[in-house]
Amino acid sequence: MKGKKTLKRTIAAEESNGTSDVKKTKALPIVTHPSHGTVGGQVLTLGQGDVGQLGLGEDIMERKKPALVTLTEDIVQAAAGGMHTVCLGASGSIYTFGCNDEGALGRDTSEEGSEMQPGKVELAEKVVQVSAGDSHTAALTEDGRVFVFGSFRDNNGVIGLLEPMKKSMVPVQVQINTPVIKIASGNDHLVLLTVDGDLYTSGCGEQGQLGRVPERFTNRGGRKGLERLLVPQCIHLKAKGSGRVHFQDVFCGAYFTFAVSQEGHVYGFGLSNYHQLGTKNTQACYAPQNLTSFKNSTKSWIGFSGGQHHTVCVDSEGKAYSLGRAEYGRLGLGENAEEQSEPTPIPDLPKINSVASGASVSYAVSTDGCVFAWGMGTNLQLGTGEEEDVWSPEQMTGKHLEDREVLSVSSGGQHTVLLVRKRS
């Protein structure tokens, strides 16, 4: 990523609706990243939906099998938050449904039942990527700006979004001077990857997931206050010799972060109490660690997804791996599996394109468009129709999957979202 210049912008006063009027001093580039969705499809949801996160209306509180969500255009990305869902349309518009207590839907839901079905977020800019956490949502525009709505929380409650103790019910712009090319959300933290290969983080840092805040300051920012946490700041990681490490990709677990350097090295920071980062010990990492457990593979890593205490990942050869906590079958390594401190191949899977995880569940999407699921069955997120835990990968079936291929999966606290399209 050479020759990119930092762009300076003049930021005008925020309008009363909460969005910023940004006067650009030069034309901004169209940002690209392999993670941006480009193939349009339909959205299926399953699991528990008592606060509307399934998007199926007021009368449907759960679905044992994937159900079709009614949307007005093709969807190129679907992201599951803790208790809400975010869909990105092919036009660049955002549709949300689910819990709006902290503003994670980014729209007015005062009309009874309006949060239970998809509604459009008012944002003039064309969006190319979305991410969702427990009670926040982020949107990346085609010119590299980031808008957020909702709030971050820590163990004591709401901490705010961009300002201390202030949530936002509508999109507000993140002030960062360099175009962003990818966004990723954990439960209560946000990571921005810039065109220059830098990582900016914001949100809760209690478990080290921001990668830039020492442990003594993670409790609401210490004497510097919440601004230390909520204002996105760059992670400065020195490289061997001179300069610093630059990154090409980033992924979030619930309370931890993975980042891949431009040289292909895997770094991690945050909670690792079950070795979910691939560290030898179970201490939290408050600064990026070069994870040697991922060097044991000669392949390049192309995808990571972290639950509460486990991680699933996939390499460039289409092989899926898991590590971390084993209870309830979330690793997919069989009923007698134990905690894993390094990436462990998941048996009985075909060639895989992508992986996903919820708190205690995991998914893998094969190159031929099938989805496999395993882990805790309590919330009906696995598509088996039963509440039993699944210890090894099982292919998900259902009426709406018979003639459709799965493009991607995203999983929240109690529900799961599939992006699918008709098989040609």
Swiss-Prot record:
GO terms for molecular function: guanyl-nucleotide exchange factor activity. It comes from the Eukaryota. One of its GO terms (cellular component) is cytoplasm. The keyword Transcription does not apply. GO terms for biological process: cell division; regulation of mitotic cell cycle; regulation of mitotic spindle assembly. RCC1 repeats lie at residues 40-90, 91-142, 144-195, 197-262, 263-316, 317-367, 368-421. Keywords: Cell cycle, Cell division, Chromosome, Cytoplasm, Guanine-nucleotide releasing factor, Mitosis, Nucleus, Repeat. It is found in: Nucleus; Chromosome; Cytoplasm. Residues 1-22 are annotated as: Disordered. It holds the Pfam family WD40_RLD. Guanine-nucleotide releasing factor that promotes the exchange of Ran-bound GDP by GTP, and thereby plays an important role in RAN-mediated functions in nuclear import and mitosis. Contributes to the generation of high levels of chromosome-associated, GTP-bound RAN, which is important for mitotic spindle assembly and normal progress through mitosis. Via its role in maintaining high levels of GTP-bound RAN in the nucleus, contributes to the release of cargo proteins from importins after nuclear import. Involved in the regulation of onset of chromosome condensation in the S phase. This is Regulator of chromosome condensation. It comes from Xenopus laevis (African clawed frog). The gene is rcc1.
